[in-house]
Every structure is written in structure tokens, then in C-alpha cells.
Regions:
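A conserved beta-strand-to-alpha-helix junction within the catalytic ATP-binding
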Residues: 4-19, 51, 86
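Conserved catalytic submotifs in the C-terminal HATPase_c
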Residues: 4-9, 26, 31-41, 77
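Glycine-rich G1-box
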Residues: 23, 94-95
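Short helix-loop "hinge" at the ATP-lid/N-box region of the Bergerat-fold HATPase_c
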Residues: 61-62
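Short beta-strand/loop element within the Bergerat-fold HATPase_c
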Residues: 69-81
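ATPase catalytic-site recognition across NTP-hydrolyzing enzymes
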Residues: 99-106
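Glycine-rich ATP-binding loops of the HATPase_c
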Residues: 137-143
Length: 173
């Protein structure tokens, strides 16, 4: 799987993804809020894969939240002289225990069997989203507490580079 790196404005991508999820959010009586740091002009990454990761995170936030709120916030940060973008998707949903979070990014895995029965899904979305972010030199992390919701954070370099030869193999192990 090869990255299709391009330079694109981040704010319209986030707006488009939120518009896609808003009808589902309305069905669950969820409010969706967006905050995008004006300092972020463009991002050099795989736009299609970032879109898919954001759709997965927002879909999950909506799936596990009823009559609550979902917020997506993007900001630019600098670490060790490199610019990064951080995109956080936070919800006021059911939340997870540390044990559940430990299984979250494994393929075909959900928090637990009762989650699969109640909410459906294959358990592939987060594993794939994490892989996409890692291919672009970033990652996805999660913070959560049962009954209080979850926050998933994507962190990507502002200028993603194509993975070095062999990096794809290491993701398959």
C-alpha cells in the first residue's frame, strides 16, 4: 500500500468529514463542534487516508455517544524543531477501561464482546486508521474513562514523507 502524498488545506478536509457525519450525529442527538487552529494552512500527507482515519474516529465517537457531544479540534505544535498537526476527536460517550483500551488497535478487536453485540462493527477501523497514520510518520493515541467518554488523538508531521523501503513490512508483523 503506497501513500499518495499531496499538499492540501486541512480545515476544508475536517469540515467535509464533519458534514458527512452530521446526519448520523443528529440521529443520536449528538452535538458536533469543530475548532481548527488558524495557523494551520496546509498539510503534506495522504489526504484520502487521513480522511478515512477521521471518518473512522468520528463514526466511532458517534456510535458510542447518545445525547452528548463530539468535538474535533486541530492545532499545530512544534517538537524538536519539527512542526506537527494534532487532531483530537473527543466524545462524551460510554468510555473505556484501561484493559479495553489495550485491545483497541488490534485487528478484528473491539473493547469487548458485548460492545460488538450492541454497537456492531468489525473492529478493523481503528487498526487501519492507526496504520495509515504510522505510514505517514504519525500515530493515534487514546485517553478514556468509563462513563466519561474518550479522546482519540492523531498526530502527524506537517510534511509527511513516504515510508522507507521495508517499513511497510514492519507494519505487517
Amino acid at each position: 500500500m503506497e501513500l499518495q502524498l499531496e499538499t492540501f488545506p486541512l480545515a476544508p478536509l475536517i469540515t467535509d468529514v464533519v458534514k458527512t457525519i452530521e446526519p448520523l450525529a443528529a440521529k443520536n442527538a449528538n452535538q458536533v463542534a469543530v475548532k481548527c487552529d488558524g495557523a494551520i494552512r496546509t498539510l503534506h500527507a495522504d489526504q484520502m487516508r487521513l480522511r478515512q482515519a477521521l471518518l473512522n474516529l468520528l463514526s466511532n465517537a458517534n456510535k458510542f455517544t447518545e445525547r452528548g457531544s463530539i468535538a474535533i479540534a486541530a492545532r499545530q505544535e512544534q517538537e524538536n524543531g519539527r512542526d506537527h498537526v494534532t487532531i483530537a476527536v473527543a466524545d462524551t460517550g460510554i468510555g473505556m477501561t484501561p484493559e479495553q483500551m489495550g485491545k483497541l488497535f488490534q485487528e478484528f478487536s473491539q473493547a469487548d464482546a458485548s460492545t460488538t453485540r450492541k454497537y456492531g462493527g468489525t473492529g478493523l477501523g481503528l487498526a487501519i486508521s492507526k496504520r495509515f497514520c504510522q505510514m505517514m510518520g504519525g500515530d493515534i493515541t487514546v485517553a478514556s474513562e468509563p462513563g466519561r467518554g474518550s479522546t482519540f488523538t492523531i498526530r502527524l508531521p506537517m510534511m509527511a514523507n513516504a515510508p522507507k523501503a521495508g517499513a511497510e513490512e514492519s507494519h505487517r508483523r
